[in-house]
Amino acid sequence: TYSDPATSKANVAASGFLPSSTTGEIVEHSYYTLSYSEPHEQAEWVAYTLKQEHLTYDDRERPYFIEDPKVSTKSADWRNYRGSGYDRGHLCPAGDRRFSEQAYNETFYTSNISPQDRDFNAGIWNRLEQKVRYWCKKYGDLMVITGGVLENDLLEIGDEHVDVPKSYYKIVMRGKAKEARALGFLMPAKESQQPLEQFLVPIDEIEKRTGIDFFEKQSQDWQSNIESEVKGRDWKF
């Protein structure tokens, strides 16, 4: 196991902002929280807080991908990906968790990966991850929620039938209470040279596509203010 029970509170994916789980399988690690979907053999969402002090560039040795001991049904074996032509795409990026060996290693649970086209993973998806780090440097603490859109009839890989999402989402939030600002991105799982702004959508739209209520513990007024429209002007691209 890569997790240390003693540090689980360091996760601080503020519990008041955690999404709903459509599966009831919420798993807390030391530095991120996820909701696992057994039928799709991956997380429907991964949520974590990114702080400026997390933004280090320490060299870390990549560990092996291992099954998540906290997922009751066991997460998929990494060998499902072998020979599939798809990358083991991190949801919580290893690059956001270089500040400690444990935090870094924890991103190598197979509950934190999803089959991604290599050009997408190394291309526009990587650009978005880098932009999130840029925003953290500029604005301070961010809450990040990310996952594939898990639908019926997706292509599957491996003996355990790991689903291959056709699109991915990422929600980034900063600020507290009435000062909160959030962006939602929804992008097809293929490389694109388009600017990231082209993939901005209201968070409401991501909720419709996924069936997830992203800020379920917040008031309806707060949710409709944050989720109903795109407010890209509040963020520097």
Language-model region placement:
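Domain-level detector for secreted/extracellular nuclease and nuclease-toxin modules, and
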Residues: 1-237
